[in-house]
Amino acid sequence: MKRVLLLLLLLYSSVTYSQSSTGRKAIREITLTGSGYELGLQHGKLLKKEIAEIVAKWKENTKAQLGKDADLVLKEFFQYAHFDDAIKKWTPDLYEEVKGIAAGSGQAFNDIMVLNLLDEFWVYENKLANHHCSGIGVPAMNGNTAYIAQNMDIESYTDGYQILLRLSKTDKRPEQFILTHPGVIALNGMNETGSGACMNTLMQLKASSTGLPVAFIVRQILNSTDKEELLQFIQTVPHASGQNYIIGIRNEVYDFEASANKVVRFDPKNTNGTIYHTNHPLANDDVKEWFAFNTTSSNSHVRLSAVQQRVKDIPTVDDGIIKDALRSKDDKDNPVCRAPKNGGFTFVSVIMTLSGTPNLQVTAGPPDESEYKKIEFTNAR
């Protein structure tokens, strides 16, 4: 019965995709070299026009959402936010990179920094709305391919600004693919050694105004080529925001729920080794006082169920099954795949192949509106 239900779900997803595909353009790709300030300066100069537009749209959106002048909100936010020390301690090159983006684009430093504090600003707002990412992890078991994948859902005003940064290899870092929009150092990504990271906001978990922000954690993960070093980092660094990290390291996948006071691994113990996550904690109990555990009908729970039923009991989960999960709209009010309306949407959908020859498949926008584009690392060409 479960297999019949799954086949029906897959068929429905395929039909929905074929009917709603709008032929979106493939994601824009940009190659950057160097590191630190130099890297940021390239980013800022190359995308100066787009960064100016994003800054203006951020301010317009913030004013509409909060009902007050965005510059005043920014001032109040940075009175709360004290992330500089953690960034300079754990990822000093990335602090310089943000400075370079600001200089290259001609924007104020705080206007660029707040774009890179996406989750931290959401925490400051303390609202659950519009934080709807859905993620999947598949280990390489029984000769199968390892994947991590995600629909990255953020505000609708970012539509049309999807970019893939290709960071060239240096003596200190592997080549990297980074999904983001202009002005931001990372939303998610992977490196050429088969390590990658996908994230889900966990607004319910306790946060810290002095921890290391999510974007900087992501880039540090992608800089790593050592499994033990990477796992040690994610479990010991002080976290600024409640966040779930699906981390792939070649043949293996891990899931960690991070809060201000603890990091807890989530493992559903599935026979096929799969993991999945949306936007509510499943293992970490370091929650804010307002959070209630009995919200089983929430948007996040509905999406988790949709993803889980597609991958949990399948012996071999391939990229086709993952695509069907990420395109799913079982509940029209709580879809995994979100159209650009009502404040938020699926900004990018990404599938990272970790084992064998690592590569990335990505759509610019909701995956039911375009086909995935496969992108390979330089050493695989």
Can you annotate each of these PLM segments?
Residues 1-22:
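Bacterial Sec-dependent N-terminal signal peptides
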Residues 2-3, 150, 166, 219, ...:
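Basic side chains
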Residues 5, 159, 163-165, 169-171, ...:
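Short, basic/low-complexity N-terminal boundary segments at the transition from targeting/disordered tails
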Residues 7-8, 39, 155, 186, ...:
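A broad, structure-centric signal for solvent-exposed, well-ordered loop/edge residues
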Residues 9-10, 157, 310:
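Enrichment for repetitive, rod-forming helical segments
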Residues 14, 19, 161-162, 168, ...:
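Alpha-helix boundary/interfacial micro-motifs
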Residues 19-127, 131-132, 141, 221-263, ...:
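C-terminus-biased signal that marks the final domain/tail of proteins
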Residues 118-216, 232, 347, 359, ...:
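Internal mixed beta-strand/loop scaffold within catalytic domains of large alpha/beta enzymes
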